[in-house]
Structure formats: C-alpha cells, structure tokens
Amino acid sequence: MKYRRVLLKLSGEALMGDREFGIDPEVVKSLAGEIARVVEAGTELAVVVGGGNIFRGVKASSSGMDRATADYVGMLATVMNALTLQDALEQQFQVQTRLLSAIEMKEVAEPFIRRRAMRHLEKGRVVIFGAGSGNPFFTTDTTAALRAAEIDAQVIFKATRVDGIYDSDPKFNPQAVRFEKITFHEVLVQNLRVMDSTAIALCRENNIPILVFNVFEKNSIYRAVQGEAVGTYVC
C-alpha cells in the first residue's frame, strides 16, 4: 500500500454521471464501492465533495446573484452530495462514515473539528467533508487542499472525468499530450487549470502532491492507492 492517508476530491459533476443535473444513484453506488475497497485495504480516506451537479455559485453570481449568497447555496449543495455518498457507503457497503460540515447543522452532520476528524480516520472511518471551507469566495478545490493539510494527508486524489492533465483540451485537440508528471510551478505558469491557483499554492507550500485521474476507469481509486501509474502526478 503506497498511501496511508488520502484526501479524495470528488467533483459534483462526477456524481451526476451522464445526466445534465442532479445525482445518478448508480454512479454514487459505484464510487462508494471503490471507496469501500480502498478502506478495507487499510488506507485512511477523507473525501471533499463538490456541488456543481446541483448549483454553481460562480455561474449564479455572473447572472446577478450576490456572490457570497451564491457560494453559500453551493455549500449547501455539497452537503446534499455528502449525505448521498454517506448513505451509499453505510447502507450498501457497511462502511463506517462521519460527515463533518464547515457550517453548523447538527441534525445532519458533526461540526468540523480537526482533531475529531483525525481520530475518526485513525478508527478506520471514512470522513466526508461538507459545506466547503464554510467561507464564500473559496472553491471546493481550495477546501480539498486546506483539509488535506489539516489532516496530514499524504496526497490529494483529484477524481475527474479525464485521465490526467493535458497540454491542451483533448476534446478540441486530438494531438493533445498528457503529462505523466508535472510540477506545481509548471501548472501555474502554463495555466493548466488542474485546480484554482489558491489550491495549487496551498499544496505547494505544504508539499502535498496531487494525482489527477479518471474516476470512471474501473478500480482507478484502488490502483492509485496502490501506487500504480494512473493519471498525472503533480508535485
């Protein structure tokens, strides 16, 4: 086992599968199964979930909505996704989980307390972080970098729809080249949009590498934990 403690960043879009909006139960079940396998193998796993399948604060603010308000709505969307993932893990795979929210909502989640999160991980529970960082103007990518630093994660797995980072968009350029390994500096200089610049800066300052890979490839999360060559490694 290459990694002992991992922070998995799941985009909201990953949860909707081929749909244009919302949550695909079959996709959630598949992801929960992958997570369960990783935990059973002995890796401590925390998850940050996005909310873009339900609401995107940046898009709403560009349409005239107050940016801070839009971001708070987006945070609530992440909690909806987190609850859905939690239910799949517990009901279908009998994996112990804890949902920790950056915004207090004691009826559905524990408040985020760093030491509590780390104790849950040590006990083999999957820790799901909801409500982003609790602050507007910050993305869930930045939340992933922040939480990874706080819980001493060895790596961030950024699970996406593509199999790594390319020098240009492979959707529009068939000759696009995929990087196997790239530095934080190169990501920023080339504006490759792996994560936003705040998240990249946090990872660079705290020496937390990022592995970007296609979450829809079978066993991709498990293979990544084992140290197999999947996706693009950013360090």
UniProtKB/Swiss-Prot annotation:
Presence of the UniProt keyword Kinase in the record: yes
The activity regulation comment is: Inhibited by UTP.
Q: Record keywords: ATP-binding included?
A: yes
User: What does the entry list as the binding residues for UMP?
Assistant: 51, 71, 133-140
Q: Which residue windows are transmembrane per the record?
A: none
Q: State the signal peptide span.
A: none
Q: What GO biological process terms are annotated to this protein in UniProt?
A: 'de novo' CTP biosynthetic process; UDP biosynthetic process
Q: Which terms does the record give in the GO molecular function aspect?
A: ATP binding; UMP kinase activity
Q: Which NCBIfam families match?
A: pyrH_bact (TIGR02075)
Q: What is this protein called?
A: Uridylate kinase
Q: Which organism is it from?
A: Gloeobacter violaceus (strain ATCC 29082 / PCC 7421)
